[in-house]
Design a protein with these regions (language model features):
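Conserved ABC transporter NBD signature motif
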Residues: 9-17
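Conserved ABC ATPase "signature" region
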Residues: 17, 68-85
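Conserved ABC ATPase signature
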Residues: 90-94, 98
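A short, proline-enriched helix->beta-strand linker immediately N-terminal to the Walker B motif
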Residues: 109-113, 129
Length: 167
């Protein structure tokens, strides 16, 4: 995703070495790769409402006219099982599970092919973890997503992964 440069080796996506891509090509590739972060308190802008958080990638990548953004944000909330009345709220007013769902919705806004999930459920209660894993599985089936799931919890991995790499 380009958040940090690789210290060794190469990172390929769709047959392309990301380190060798031009900034323009990398921007286009980033639309196809998104991230769900572990710490939603740090990854969601506290100065933006949920609608603003979901609108940001749509604006940056110019995916739809500005007047359509509120409707797109509402549909994204529907897809992650959140009520539309959360659009006007700020991240601090949401539960941990709701914030994680907003993070997932933000990742889905660009219709990526690959989503990197960095410990997406480790900060959540066990009951909410199961709901979140089921949501991720449902979204994967509906959208044909590929996940790279980073987790220390082998139970989460066994529930979610088709292939496993232990580091």
């Amino acid at each position: 995703l380009g958040l940090l440069p690789p210290t060794q080796g190469q990172v390929f996506f769709d047959g392309r070495d990301l380190a060798a891509c031009s900034p323009r090509d990398l921007r286009a590739l980033r639309r196809q790769m998104q991230m769900v972060f572990q710490d939603t308190a740090a990854s969601l802008n506290p100065r933006l409402t949920v609608e603003g958080i979901l609108a940001e990638p749509l604006r940056v990548h110019r995916l739809c006219p500005r007047r359509e953004i509120p409707a797109r944000a509402a549909v994204l909330l529907d897809q992650v099982g959140l009520p539309r009345d959360l659009l006007g709220r700020y991240p601090h007013a949401l539960s941990g599970g709701q914030r994680q769902r907003v993070g997932i919705a933000r990742a889905l806004a660009l219709s990526p092919r690959l989503v990197v999930c960095d410990e997406p459920v480790s900060a959540l209660d066990v009951s909410v973890q199961a709901q979140m894993l089921n949501l991720l599985a449902d979204l994967q089936a509906a959208r044909g997503l590929t996940y790279v799931l980073v987790s220390h919890d082998l139970g989460v991995v066994s529930h979610s992964a088709d292939r496993v790499c232990v580091m």
